[in-house]
Amino acid sequence: QKPTSEYLEEVFKQLCSYKEISRDQPPSIIVESTLSANVLDDLIIPLIEKNGLKVGKDLLLGVAPRRDWFVDADKTLKTLPRVVGGTNKETTDLMVDVLGLICDTVLRANDHKHAAIVKSIENAYRQLEITFANQLSVAYPNIDMKHVLKLVGTKWNVGTYHPSFGIGGYCIPLAPHYVLEGAKNKEALSLLK
């Protein structure tokens, strides 16, 4: 599997075809998709500008990676911290105000690039940790690795992961590709290859 921006690109093509955009009250678009750090700069912003619109003036654009956890009722859109980053400070400020109506904690990223890569890195961490748990289980077949990892997880700075038949939904295996896609020095990320 490889990451694709095809659907995101198609949505923005449709948005840009809408010609009645008010320059007095420019629309705000918050992208929640899993992204590489450079997809807005390399693909989406040029597409918007090719259609005669100026990002930050005619259209406000930012990123707020989705965070949800369906297995725990205490982890909701309201309680999970949201990361936001706009293409300029004004957009970020607006995103904080809008998402602050719903979310208890809104965290400002330096900009849209920093916000964009958050979800990919979160998911890549998760994949590495679960893969390691699975490998430990195979490497030590005579040890109850679930039990050992539960004990390991009692240390304050180590997460608790358990061996399983997989590593998560469709997005988890894609995460390393998103991280690598935007990296200038891909060879430095040998764990993700």
Describe every region a protein language model picked out.
Residues 1-193:
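Structural/interface elements that position substrates and couple domains in central-metabolism enzymes
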